[in-house]
From Swiss-Prot:
It is found in: Cytoplasm. The gene is frr. This is Ribosome-recycling factor. GO terms for molecular function: ribosomal large subunit binding. Belongs to the RRF family.
Length: 185
């Protein structure tokens, strides 16, 4: 029973960290990344489709993303979707493909991005603490129901805290890595 509580908690904590990593992939650094365009939906013959389902995305240079639609009629809707995305990117269309050139980030913008990264990391830590609280509540309930002894409960709580500390350290590590990436000129 204790192992079930701890393994369930561990799975939830891992998912929280993975969610933070995915969120960080969408953050614009000075470098081009196709994950910037993950949330863009294109009007494809009356249906909203993810951009990567109607075109091939490539990164030929460090600050350039090329979008090659599978159907040339899709260039205008793709361009429109990018303009409406609030990413601050200006698509350049040559009739066959769309080029997105990412402007270099200003120092001020980099600092704003880092502040947002820190807020996201703090939110992830709050989620981890909530998961820890739920696990400890489950352990206390098991002890109250006499399913486990008080000693087992205390040992399990210490294990829960150790897992929480290691996951918080992982969040800090992910934040530090992304912060370096953003501040790199």
């Amino acid at each position: 029973m204790v192992k079930d509580v701890i393994s369930s908690m561990n799975v939830h904590m891992d998912k929280s960290i993975e969610s933070l990593r995915k969120e960080y992939q969408k953050v614009r650094t000075g470098r081009a990344s196709t994950s910037l365009l993950d949330d863009i939906k294109v009007d494809s013959y009356g249906t909203l489709s993810p951009l990567n389902q109607v075109a091939t995305l490539a990164i030929p240079e460090a600050r350039t993303i090329t979008i090659s639609p599978w159907d040339s009629k899709m260039i205008a809707p793709i361009e429109k979707a990018i303009m409406n995305s609030n990413l601050g990117l200006n698509p350049a269309n040559d009739g066959k493909m769309i080029r997105l050139t990412l402007p270099p980030l200003t120092e001020e913008r980099r600092k704003d991005i880092v502040k947002q990264l820190k807020r996201d990391a703090e939110d992830a830590k709050v989620a981890l603490r909530n998961i820890r609280r739920d696990a400890i509540d489950q352990l206390k309930k098991l002890e109250k129901d006499k399913s486990i002894s008080e000693d087992e409960q205390k040992r399990a709580e210490k294990e829960v805290q150790d897992f929480t500390n290691s996951h918080v350290a992982k969040v800090d590590e992910v934040l530090l890595h992304k912060e370096k990436e953003v501040m790199e000129v």
